[in-house]
Amino acid sequence: MIKVGIVGGTGYTGVELLRLLAQHPEVELTAITSRTEAGMPVAEMFPSLRGRVALKFTTPDEAKLNECDVVFFATPHGVAMAQAKELLANGVKVLDLAADFRLKDVKEFAKWYGMEHNCPEILAEAVYGLPEINRDAIKKARVVGLAGCYPTSVQLGLAPLLSPKSTGGKHLIDGTHIISDSKSGTSGAGRKAEIGTLLSEASDNFKAYSVKGHRHLPEIEQGLKAIAGHDQIGLTFVPHLTPMIRGIHSTLYVRLTEAGKDVDYQKLYENFYKDEPFVDVMPAGSHPETRSVRGSNGIRIAIHRPGGGDTLVILVVEDNLVKGASGQGVQCMNLMFGLPETTGLTQIAVSP
């Protein structure tokens, strides 16, 4: 059994981790930390886990995290990098759901997250946690910085158009002019109290935010450049807040080059993802819905070419708390410990 600890178990990604790991046949939950809720039974805070998780929240000092095989950080940015060095020294693997180990450039990290990175040597060895792209590296990793929710949808939506193994080295699209129009449910903002996510503010409302620049932008650009194998990437990324709890819907717009105008893109996507257990390339003309993946680790993609013109539209949906966060973390953990990738992640989406 894999002994698992969770640092920061009181937020939405934390409880989602608990839900998934409590059902995982190869996991023993050994510690869940919270400084503010230490001593409280987990099931008291989250009644949905009653009878499934018997642990109490503990302080990080009492949790004996060094005795775990792997520790998940479902914490604000900056926490994982402060504790990773000691855990790694004790042979504990680290999976961070925040951004501490995503951006490889420490200056970019400081610019977008407002803090200096205090362990660049660990950042250098960290693997970006997007299994469909970095599977082999994740298998050998000690530290994984999980891909963000928006970045997961955008990168998986565009990978078949950029990856040389799919394109044969041809530039099928103008990579310098990509548009991502992305929408998220309110759980993406976390569990903290904020005016913008209060029911009276978010319900019956729809708005864009961070149009000037969202902190996921450099992460997406970094990932797309790595997938393409070149730096000729330009992205306009505009996120929106929608009046729903879970879900991300990204509508991606790309312009085809002359080399890309005679390609069967439905077939291209189907071939690229044919062996991926969590990626569903839907039939031509489909319109995926966020509720079709709610509570599951699946991601659904549909390809459109309006009027047969030179614009390709890719629709992508995922559950931001599962494939966009905790489920992807479990998927990476499975790879790191040599388990089948789908172990503990076969939940069917909840509908309605």
Swiss-Prot record:
Short name of one Pfam family: Semialdhyde_dhC_1
Keyword Transferase in record: no
Keywords: Amino-acid biosynthesis, Arginine biosynthesis, Cytoplasm, NADP, Oxidoreductase
Catalytic activities: N-acetyl-L-glutamate 5-semialdehyde + phosphate + NADP(+) = N-acetyl-L-glutamyl 5-phosphate + NADPH + H(+)
E.C. designation(s): 1.2.1.38
Coiled-coil parts of chain: none
Pathway: Amino-acid biosynthesis; L-arginine biosynthesis; N(2)-acetyl-L-ornithine from L-glutamate: step 3/4
GO BP annotation list: L-arginine biosynthetic process
A molecular-function term among this protein's GO annotations: N-acetyl-gamma-glutamyl-phosphate reductase activity
Predominant localisation class: cytoplasm
GO cellular component: cytoplasm
Source superkingdom: Bacteria
Subcellular location: Cytoplasm
Active site, UniProt feature: 149
The protein's role, per its UniProt record: Catalyzes the NADPH-dependent reduction of N-acetyl-5-glutamyl phosphate to yield N-acetyl-L-glutamate 5-semialdehyde.
Family: Belongs to the NAGSA dehydrogenase family. Type 1 subfamily.
Protein name according to UniProt: N-acetyl-gamma-glutamyl-phosphate reductase
UniProt source species: Polynucleobacter asymbioticus (strain DSM 18221 / CIP 109841 / QLW-P1DMWA-1) (Polynucleobacter necessarius subsp. asymbioticus)
